[in-house]
């Protein structure tokens, strides 16, 4: 039997995932602050602002801008808000979400200033026990999922039964979720790969080819794995869908906002100029400095994140970034 599911945030990924949930037979309520988006989904089953490629969203999707109305009957609440605004947005829902509801994060990022993962931010904001929090991450480019191309993802929750409930609620003929209890690993994968995607995109935009991209991706994977394991993650997670899988998708597609943002930097645009031409948030941009700070906190070197931080804050070029990344000393891989 279908569930009542609320999605907080009607951006491209939130809307595409809402469609997955509706296709799986659930009753889906989208919550958004923008009245134009609310009216578009509610009255016309169309999100012309964030997901115009889908001409008609399912009939069992609706929308509201009222927080209490959005979540009052929810069995599952999905959070698809820009990571750096999650805490501010979620405190407005504290006390409104039913006690039995599972809260699921689609967000990927490390909070600036606190260096906290999204599971920590969500649980603190809503005063939520660990067994009622789940995260979803994987090679999930929103436009391809909106077009119903076959895809898989990973659902993580410390309570495997609740992870399974969430997975069952988003299983369709084209969308296959797997389950794990490694919340930390899933969160770290989703956050840190965005920094790698920025760097790969920058290299591509600057005209470098496959060798350079592969070099950055593999060193990025090593960096995010070391950081994740230091934070308490299972190393196996980094070699599955949420790790290598997401890295491949994000670092190799113009559909990735992080890759595209990096490519624009590589072509010579400033951070401000690249931001202006982006449709939506490239989460890797605010996450980069937080990753460097987290590495310092955990005593784990983060050379790629550090060099990308220099790109974003000092405006160094792609060639300078790559030179700084590898240095001149011979080291073990």
UniProtKB/Swiss-Prot annotation:
It is an enzyme of class 1 (oxidoreductase). Pathway: Membrane lipid metabolism; glycerophospholipid metabolism. The keyword Iron-sulfur does not apply. Gene3D superfamilies: N-(1-d-carboxylethyl)-l-norvaline Dehydrogenase, domain 2, NAD(P)-binding Rossmann-like Domain. Keywords: Cytoplasm, Lipid biosynthesis, Lipid metabolism, NAD, NADP, Nucleotide-binding, Oxidoreductase, Phospholipid biosynthesis, Phospholipid metabolism. SUPFAM superfamilies: 6-phosphogluconate dehydrogenase C-terminal domain-like (SSF48179), NAD(P)-binding Rossmann-fold domains (SSF51735). It holds the Pfam family NAD_Gly3P_dh_C. Catalyzes the reduction of the glycolytic intermediate dihydroxyacetone phosphate (DHAP) to sn-glycerol 3-phosphate (G3P), the key precursor for phospholipid synthesis. This is Glycerol-3-phosphate dehydrogenase [NAD(P)+]. It comes from Bifidobacterium longum (strain NCC 2705).
């Amino acid at each position: 039997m279908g569930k009542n599911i609320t999605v907080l945030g009607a951006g491209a990924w939130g809307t595409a995932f809402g469609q997955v949930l509706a296709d799986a037979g659930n009753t889906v309520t989208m919550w958004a602050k923008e009245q134009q988006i609310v009216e578009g989904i509610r009255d016309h089953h169309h999100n012309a602002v964030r997901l115009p490629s889908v001409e008609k969203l399912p009939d069992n999707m609706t929308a509201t801008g009222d927080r209490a109305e959005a979540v009052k009957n929810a069995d599952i609440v999905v959070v698809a808000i820009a990571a750096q605004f999650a805490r501010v947005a979620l405190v407005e829902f504290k006390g409104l979400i039913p006690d039995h509801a599972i809260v699921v994060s689609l967000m990927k990022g490390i909070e600036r200033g606190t260096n906290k993962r999204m599971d920590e931010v969500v649980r603190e904001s809503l005063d939520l026990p660990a067994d009622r929090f789940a995260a979803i991450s994987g090679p999930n480019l929103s436009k391809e999922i909106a077009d119903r191309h076959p895809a898989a993802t990973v659902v993580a929750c410390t309570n495997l039964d609740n992870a399974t409930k969430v997975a069952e609620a988003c299983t369709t003929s084209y969308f296959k979720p797997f389950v794990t209890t490694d919340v930390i690993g899933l969160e770290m994968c989703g956050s840190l790969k965005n920094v790698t995607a920025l760097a790969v995109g920058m290299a591509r935009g600057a005209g470098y080819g496959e060798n350079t991209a592969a070099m950055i991706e593999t060193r990025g994977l090593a960096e995010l794995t070391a950081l994740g394991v230091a934070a308490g993650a299972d190393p196996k997670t980094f070699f599955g869908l949420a790790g290598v899988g997401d890295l491949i998708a994000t670092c190799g597609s113009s559909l990735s906002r992080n890759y595209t943002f990096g490519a624009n930097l590589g072509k010579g645009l400033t951070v401000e100029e690249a931001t202006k031409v982006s449709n939506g948030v490239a989460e890797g941009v605010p996450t980069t400095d937080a990753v460097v700070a987290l590495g310092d906190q955990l005593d784990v070197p983060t050379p790629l994140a550090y060099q990308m931080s220099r790109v974003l804050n000092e405006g160094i070029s792609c060639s300078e970034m790559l030179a700084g990344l590898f240095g001149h000393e011979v080291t073990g891989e």
